[in-house]
Amino acid sequence: MMIKQAEFITSAVSITDLPKDDFDHFLILGRSNVGKSSLINAITNRKKLARVSQTPGKTITLNLYLLNQSLYLVDAPGYGYAKRSKTQTLTFMRMINEYIQLNGHLKKIILLVDFNIGPTQDDLDMYIELQAFDVDIIVVTTKYDKVKSSHRLKQEKVIRSKFFEGQKIYFTSSETKFGIDKLINEEFSNE
């Protein structure tokens, strides 16, 4: 699938704020600063569609981007940000749970993991928690280019060992676009 059109539509804090149409949603989850906005920009081939911040915890709403007038990429706030208060963390978790449980258009959850660091305990906890929902989960690693090529195969094996057998995992780099076309063609092509 070729992404010909991409635009920011809205920010939502509740299920009632979502657009009232029938387009499929693809939720992008991951730790703060894992590269969610950069991945959206790489998928859409637009450098500044999603604002990229060097400061963790900037995204506090669900940000919806409409692709090809047919599906939404939904950028969620990052989890695991230490400077968020417990109240903010609970509000975030409630918003995500409500979105997953009540959004009848959620097609897939894309869980981002930093390839260089590997899955953190927060990533693994989120992965286990997501198993309770009847939604396809895709693991996408980011920052593949940050690891020396001689160490990549070993890191791929380490990452695969942390998830359930048969889990679909994509290795990507927003910087070099490595793996982006494969992700688009395999996960968004039928949309």
Swiss-Prot record:
Its cofactor is Mg(2+). GO terms for biological process: division septum assembly. GO terms for molecular function: GTP binding; metal ion binding. The keyword Nucleotide-binding applies. Residues 22-191 form the EngB-type G domain. The keyword Secreted does not apply. SUPFAM superfamilies: P-loop containing nucleoside triphosphate hydrolases (SSF52540). GTP binds at residues 30-37, 57-61, 75-78, 142-145, 172-174. GO terms for cellular component: cytosol. Mg(2+) binds at S37, T59. PROSITE patterns: G_ENGB. It comes from the Bacteria. Belongs to the TRAFAC class TrmE-Era-EngA-EngB-Septin-like GTPase superfamily. EngB GTPase family. Necessary for normal cell division and for the maintenance of normal septation. NCBIfam families: GTPase_YsxC. This is Probable GTP-binding protein EngB. It comes from Acholeplasma laidlawii (strain PG-8A). The gene is engB.
